Amino acid sequence: MKAYAVPFEKYVNLADARLGTRAISVTDDWFADVNRLFQPTPAVWKEGVFDDNGKWMDGWESRRKRFEGYDHAVIRLGVPGWIKGVDIDTSFFTGNYPPSASLEACFVADGDPSDATVWTEILPAVELKGNSHHYHEIAFDKPVSHLRFNIYPDGGVARLRVHGIPYRDWSSVGHNEQVDLAAALNGGRALACSDEHFGRMSNILNPNRGENMGDGWETARRRTPGNDWVIVALGHPGEIERVVVDTLHFKGNYPDSCSIQAAYVKGGTDSQIETQSLFWRELLPSQKLSMHAEHEFAGQIAKLGPVTHVRLNIFPDGGVSRLRLFGKVVK
């Protein structure tokens, strides 16, 4: 398993650029583009690289402020959600990081905030250090669509991670409409897995096809009996009718085969669900996989009725780029 610095890191990064997150306004990003904050990859240092405005930095960096005030950016999250925690990452910013930062939030069902929008502070001003991660749990029980990220008074931040549970208004989904119940944009969440040595389990629920092999879930080579697996909580209970297992970019390291189990889980913690998953019913019997391809299954799927969770088993190990679970919502 990959080590998580804090428990809330296992939740979806709502501020991931791959989900569509972007800044809709910023007071100043003279030295470094504010949208670098949302890149899924860790920040990097490029020795001796300069552009027209100065040293190239992997993050958001404003000019030195010579007047009263502070810098801020208004961010539209790629997917609204309930925020569990944030990481304000100042990697490689040493003599140019902000001494402190804060976060405000709002929910706008359609469009972007206006002058009349009411913002709520969800993270009071916290002290920042250079070249460091700053993890903070968030206690706010309402969904958030936009953030205002304030830095005092100026400076640079490498990444802003906003971990939480995605929100979707399921009342707008038609009774016979087929949707991807596992998609991160629809509230799907990877809960646990046997191993994620090379790639995070949450990647398999991202939109679009994978950008490269790193944009997927990949386990270490298995040297003991057994197989690898990942458990996914659906965004909404539903009846699964079609499954897509995509091994894009995985050529010499794709699984030989896969199967899927499923259940309707009414309660329990993530760790309890992990144990229960051993006994879930079979949704998709073992299917052969091939390299670098989308595999679609429909006729092979068992009619289990409504389910809330699935367990993807891969045999014996390897990498999967995306998992799609299409079905109808059960209300």
From Swiss-Prot:
Q: Name one Pfam family in it.
A: Allantoicase
Catalytically driven reaction(s): allantoate + H2O = (S)-ureidoglycolate + urea
Q: Which UniProt keywords apply?
A: Hydrolase, Purine metabolism
- For the protein in the UniProt heading, the enzyme class is hydrolase
Q: Per its UniProt record, what InterPro entries does this chain match?
A: Allantoicase (IPR005164), Allantoicase_dom (IPR015908), Galactose-bd-like_sf (IPR008979)
- Output the Gene3D superfamilies linked to this UniProt entry: Galactose-binding domain-like
| Pathway field | Nitrogen metabolism; (S)-allantoin degradation; (S)-ureidoglycolate from allantoate (aminidohydrolase route): step 1/1
GO terms under biological process:
allantoin catabolic process; purine nucleobase metabolic process
Q: Which domain of life is it from?
A: Bacteria
PANTHER family referenced in this protein's UniProt entry, alphabetically: ALLANTOICASE (PTHR12045), INACTIVE ALLANTOICASE-RELATED (PTHR12045:SF3)
Among NCBIfam families, the record links this protein to: allantoicase (TIGR02961)
Name of the protein this chain belongs to: Probable allantoicase
Q: From which organism does this entry originate?
A: Stutzerimonas stutzeri (strain A1501)
